[in-house]
Amino acid sequence: MKTRYVNALCYRGGEFAAGSLLVEDGRFAADAPAAAADRTVDLGGLHVVPGLVDVHVHLREPGFPHKETIATGTAAAARGGYTTVCSMPNLDPAPDTPDHLRVQTDLIRRDAVVRVVPYASITLGQRGCGELVDFAALAPEVVGFSDDGRGVQSAELMEEAMRRAAAVGKPIVAHCEVDCLLRGGYIHDGGYCRTHGHKGICSESEWRQVERDIALAEKTGCQYHVCHVSTRESVELVRQAKARGLRVSCETAPHYLLLCDEDLQEEGRFKMNPPLRSRADRDALLAGIADGTIDV
């Protein structure tokens, strides 16, 4: 069956332009205005884009199905136009051996409605310390290696992880957080925190590890990606790394672009890690989006 979709704004060649699409038996086909179609659908000026990719999702299965499952998470992804998602390894068991990874990939094959590519953990048990996983054994089935939710605390351990990741052609995807700088904090160490007597999380707890890891990436030649940057210092470090030609990228999240710690005054439920930072940090993130420093 052939269906032509008309009156669409199609994303082609880096921009949106008016056009139409021909779908034949569920697949896009070369469209010619004169080609016959079994039916025509007027999209009324809707935007049409290729399938989107989310490089940082938490499907939480196996281990935590009360939080999310592969079935529910991928259904939500499909609803939003995402056809590929990369699943973080905060699971039980953590995907730190081929057998543990297989528990997840079996569920993916059974339940996923979009393409799911998993991350393996960097350390056994995804602890951010201790022993590294077998990178070579896990590499064929994963998009990269991450201990997301925990920073790898030892520079020596991270350097060896980067060497092993580089050897198998996979990126290190890092949650950057220096544990000894957290000091029991739970919101950003800024004006709101001090005014109301809360325990704060300093910006240095993030950017200090970003700084360390970029130096290690330069030393090892590893491709390196920083998860959910939240501070202006992190943005500037990534900007400088890119200017030096390093294979460094980063992401942020919508709440860090829309909100800051001042918004805690009106809504105390805004608790996440990393925390909402200052207005100056938010502005730096927006500038990083605008100039291409922040990739995702």
Model-derived features: positions:
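Divalent metal-coordination and catalytic microenvironments
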Residues: 8, 21, 26, 45, ...
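Active-site mouth loops of central-metabolism enzymes
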Residues: 55-68, 89-91, 117-130, 149, ...
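Histidine/acidic residue-rich metal-binding segments in metalloenzymes
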Residues: 130-296
